[in-house]
Amino acid sequence: GKSVCFQVPAMMREGIAIVVTPLIALMKDQVQNLNDRGIRALCVNAGMNRREVDVALNNAAYGDFKFLYVSPERLGTRLFQSYLQEMNVSFIVVDEAHCISQWGYDFRPDYLQIGKLRSLVDAPVIALTATATPKVADDIMERLGFEQRNLIKSGFERPNLSYIVRKCEDKLGKLLSVCDSVPGTGIVYVRSRKKTEELSAFLTSNGISSSFYHAGLGTDSRTD
């Protein structure tokens, strides 16, 4: 739903929209979805070598593309900024904008530098998130130079989703029961990297197709 808020306006304007997003998987998924619809989009991520990055940025600057997805760490590089001057930027988009406040002060400080793009590019800026508290929203606006009148909020109720808390003694047994009774694919969130691997092994040993994902995986594994 958030993507429509910037993809449709960007399609109506000349130039290319720069979309800042935190995760390679999310980046690739959105680029693939756009390309599948005949909308030219590309991305630059940490899994690419310098030659691939150079080609992608050259295409963004001189080719007929509508969207360029990048991580916040890419914005401050010399190579990116040299090509940025050649781009006809239609929008600057900060997707998952809560990361500015929640990640920027700790392990991804480049999130705090996104606002500097406004002095380099004369283009509208939009920041989107579905998980901002009032404090986080204020921090986002301060970091990006937004005024209070530019803040648009909507309700969080989603009639197609439900949150249910069930207390149980045998959590693993309950998980197996859910896997057996509920059709489709599910996601299980746990507290540690080690636990993701242990739980995946447990499910696999019980005949349930499973894999695990965490930040400690290599680029190839995370992409697959």
What is the predicted function of each stretch?
Residues 1-8, 17-21:
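Walker A/P-loop
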Residues 9-13, 28-224:
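Helicase motor core with emphasis on the C-terminal RecA-like subdomain
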